[in-house]
Amino acid sequence: MSKIVVVGANHAGTACIKTMLTNYGDANEIVVFDQNSNISFLGCGMALWIGEQIAGPEGLFYSDKEELESLGAKVYMESPVQSIDYDAKTVTALVDGKNHVETYDKLIFATGSQPILPPIKGAEIKEGSLEFEATLENLQFVKLYQNSADVIAKLENKDIKRVAVVGAGYIGVELAEAFQRKGKEVVLIDVVDTCLAGYYDRDLTDLMAKNMEEHGIQLAFGETVKEVAGNGKVEKIITDKNEYDVDMVILAVGFRPNTTLGNGKIDLFRNGAFLVNKRQETSIPGVYAIGDCATIYDNATRDTNYIALASNAVRTGIVAAHNACGTDLEGIGVQGSNGISIYGLHMVSTGLTLEKAKRLGFDAAVTEYTDNQKPEFIEHGNFPVTIKIVYDKDSRRILGAQMAAREDMSMGIHMFSLAIQEGVTIEKLALTDIFFLPHFNKPYNYITMAALGAKD
């Protein structure tokens, strides 16, 4: 029997553990260490909880220690791993306040990521805090269930009237909406001059920016935060251009991979993530890394990349589980497919934006089209959809796609995700069999029309 130690039990770790136990039973001994008090919190639901769009956090968990142990794992919660001896193959963790040494045959890192702490005066985390507790009251980081619960409790204080959200990526934009729905004044700050810049081209980010402004969110794009000021608690946030009187500051500038346990022994990617192959194996044989702490193969760029998404965490966990248990399995790569819904504006994307494709050296072009989902004689449930398809002019290969609408058209992006994965050309997409029925779409579907419009 082989002993497999898993460090971390959130999305990637949970998927990995369940895959090993349900597919290989008691063929292996599975031991798990996690520094948190809970597992499987769906951080994507944090904004829904804060904005009172769901009743409470109970549905944001899908597994727990008891379930994993019922399947056969030994799980140590609130037990941070202190060190790893890769030669002796031992893991030392702090269990109930005492050092606990566990041997292993295979090791799987699912250590995730942690919030980026930007060089901002006044923005500091308390020494030794595992829950990203700031030294300044009402300066909040967003990662764990505990962070969300803390923010929600503080929002009951009627003195907190104005909130600044720093970072206009997915999390920042969702939280800005949530605080406004909660009745707070909101200012959204980002050093870039738009929002969601990593996922959409400028015309669609402008659409989202206008959407937020129409709902009362103050946008402060193109501003660099210099200081969070206050006497013991947040009182104002200072940028290179303005000062804003606020009662709470949320830092949502992104996450960095948590790879400190590599201890200089494991090869790292340029951003510090564990560098892995398609089996999720690191540079040390028998040591795997999954989820936000690891790299992943990007089918759009056809190269190794870092794309921190819960969907990727689950897939990498499954791949590592089979390999650690002796079944040779390679991941097929990802496209970074994602989506967002703010005040009823739905946007989805996959692969590369035009701007990013050009920055990476592709001779890229875009074809775009806006049309109603259904024929005009369908008077109800009809809505306009905007689509953009990015492709390489040399190979004609589809590199990315973006869609926006006021109704749910999200399933369409999966076609483009598969197209990027399989190297489909823009010409082949134009001839793809897309059915027509007026209840659903037009004879010339907007996907077909956009593909036919590719002239370069």
From Swiss-Prot:
InterPro entries: FAD-bd_OxRdtase (IPR050260), FAD/NAD-bd_sf (IPR036188), FAD/NAD-binding_dom (IPR023753), FAD/NAD-linked_Rdtase_dimer_sf (IPR016156), Pyr_nucl-diS_OxRdtase_dimer (IPR004099). The modification Cysteine sulfinic acid (-SO2H) is found at residue 44. It catalyses: 2 NADH + O2 + 2 H(+) = 2 NAD(+) + 2 H2O. NAD(+) binds at residues 171, 190, 199, 254, 308, 339. Binds 1 FAD per subunit. This is NADH oxidase. The active site is at 11 (proton acceptor), 44 (redox-active). Catalyzes the four-electron reduction of molecular oxygen to water. NCBIfam families: NOXase_Strep (NF046103). FAD binds at residues 10, 12, 34-35, 44, 81, 110, 113, 143, 170, 292, 309-311, 436. Keywords: FAD, Flavoprotein, NAD, Oxidation, Oxidoreductase, Redox-active center. Its cofactor is FAD. It comes from Streptococcus pyogenes serotype M6 (strain ATCC BAA-946 / MGAS10394). Its EC number is 1.6.3.4. One of its GO terms (molecular function) is NADH dehydrogenase (ubiquinone) activity. The lineage of its organism: Bacteria, Bacillati, Bacillota, Bacilli, Lactobacillales. Belongs to the class-III pyridine nucleotide-disulfide oxidoreductase family. It is an enzyme of class 1 (oxidoreductase).
